[in-house]
Design a protein with these regions (language model features):
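Bacterial N-terminal signal peptides that target proteins for export
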Residues: 2-15
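Beta-propeller-forming repeat regions
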Residues: 30-202, 216-248
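Acidic/hydrophobic-patterned starts of short beta strands in beta-sheet-rich repeat architectures
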Residues: 206-217
Length: 248
């Protein structure tokens, strides 16, 4: 009986090819920039108990994770509701519920922003290239940040911001105080006080470029006004201006 035996040299070439392909895949995987979740301090303040550090695997779970306490909500019909996780909060908001007390409205909106931020962070994937590897929150950031970050308190100021290129052009930042690598305070020329927090980095829109997720808290030094906002920013070179991929 004749056996169809593959020549040894052909078999060796196949083995070498397979090993080369495997090594190439490993090299490509190792070169990918994995998402970074940087909001551990905010998480510790948000939940009444210790939870796992943020990761790709558990980010989406935060929608249903119990906070350890309840928020009281109400809607126009005087119907009341208690919520204790992000998923229930979003559902209640979509059906007309808001803060039960007027003075709690700012906190209610801040909770919505934080929950939405976690949902957006869950969309991040590994990136192939980064133009924010050396990014820092410092006094130069307003010169590169988009005008969408402007402290908007009226329709007029919103329209004006749309005609400008950078955040600094809109708000004329006068002073910066860096709190940590992921948080800084910015003071503008009209008594506005804004806190920027970098919550995550990763590829948000599947273009292979690393993007950055931030939250911005607005307040007035001489008043009680406050608002919270979230953004995904990106840029196409180290010195390019940031553009907005998503806003909430």
């Amino acid at each position: 009986m004749l056996l169809n035996v593959m020549p040894v040299n052909h078999l060796s070439l196949l083995v070498i090819f397979a090993l080369t392909l495997l090594v190439s895949k490993c090299v490509i995987a190792s070169e990918l920039i994995q998402p970074q979740y940087l909001d551990s301090e905010r998480t510790d303040r948000f939940f009444a108990r210790e939870i796992a550090q943020p990761s790709k695997e558990n980010m989406q779970l935060r929608n249903s994770l119990d906070w350890g306490y309840e928020l009281e909500l109400k809607r126009a019909s005087d119907e009341e509701k208690l919520v204790s996780n992000c998923q229930d909060l979003a559902t209640a908001n979509s059906t007309g519920f808001t803060a039960a007390k007027a003075y709690e409205y700012g906190a209610f909106k801040a909770y919505l922003t934080q929950c939405q931020t976690w949902s957006e962070m869950a969309k991040l994937a590994a990136s192939k290239r980064s133009f924010i590897s050396d990014f820092k929150l410092d006094d130069t950031f307003p010169n590169f940040a988009p005008s969408a970050l402007a402290f908007v308190i009226s329709d007029e100021s919103a329209e004006k911001a749309k005609t400008l290129s950078t955040w600094d052009e809109a708000d004329h930042i006068q002073r910066t105080q860096v709190i940590s690598e992921v948080r800084a305070e910015y003071y503008d020329s009209t008594d506005g006080f804004q806190v920027i927090t970098v919550t995550a980095k990763g590829d948000y829109n599947a273009d292979g470029i690393e993007d950055i997720v931030i939250e911005k808290e607005n307040s007035v030094l001489s008043g009680s006004y406050s608002s919270s906002h979230g953004y995904v920013l990106t840029r196409m070179s180290e010195q390019a201006l940031f553009t907005v991929l998503a806003e909430w």
